Swiss-Prot record:
Keywords, ordered alphabetically: Acyltransferase, Cytoplasm, Transferase
Descriptive protein name: Leucyl/phenylalanyl-tRNA--protein transferase
A GO molecular function held by the record: leucyl-tRNA--protein transferase activity
Main location: cytoplasm
Taxonomy, superkingdom: Bacteria
InterPro entries in UniProt: Acyl_CoA_acyltransferase, Leu/Phe-tRNA_Trfase, Leu/Phe-tRNA_Trfase_C
Length: 194
């Protein structure tokens, strides 16, 4: 059974949980190559900069973590399953109640349009998932996350496994040894997400 203590210990050692929709089990993943976002070189796309400048979305932090994780746990378009199991949702809700898991949300006309969630430990933020209901809402939420991490002087934004969307946003892959070096340095920091 997945629990908060084991999840936190796993993150400290470079692992993260992933549910298998086929057998319902949760497995620990530690990829040889890790997707991370270099915070010092991140630059939002022109579209995202325009949306932020024009205040198209109302950006909030931790306003409705439960709704964000519920949307993230839904299967994506053209997919019938998700890696975010009920067991994972329950643990992250508990992590949120402990002040360790956070969400960044975009609202349009008072409705949740997109967002993301993850865990903050020391100077590391472990991005878990994002979703959108309106075009570019998750990208604007991501931009807000990066701005918050820079403001608080975080060192590491872990995106776990590379995919085309993360690459488009600016993620790069590093090998496991380099990831563990960056993680150790980030975990030494005593800072808060908010």
């Amino acid at each position: 059974m997945l629990n908060v203590r084991d999840v936190l210990r796993a993150y400290l050692h470079g692992y993260f949980p992933m549910g298998d929709p086929d057998d319902g089990n949760v497995y620990w993943c530690r990829p040889r190559r890790r997707a991370v976002f270099p915070l010092d070189t991140y630059r939002a796309s022109r579209v995202v900069r325009r949306l932020v400048r024009d205040n198209v979305f109302d950006i909030q932090i931790n306003r409705d973590f439960n709704a964000v994780i519920a949307h993230c746990a839904k299967p994506r378009r053209h997919e019938s399953e998700t890696w975010i199991s009920d067991e994972i949702v329950a643990v992250y809700l508990e992590l949120h109640s402990l002040g360790l898991a956070h969400s960044v949300e975009c609202y349009a006309d008072g409705e949740l349009a997109g967002g993301l969630y993850g865990i903050a430990l020391g100077g590391a933020f472990f991005g878990e998932s994002m979703f959108f209901r309106q075009p570019n809402a998750s990208k604007v939420a991501f931009d807000a996350l990066v701005r918050q991490l820079k403001l608080q002087r975080f060192d590491l934004l872990d995106a776990q496994i590379m995919n085309p969307h993360l690459e488009f946003l600016g993620a790069v892959e590093i090998d496991h040894e380099e990831y563990m070096r960056q993680l150790a340095m980030a975990l030494e920091k005593k800072i808060s997400f908010l």
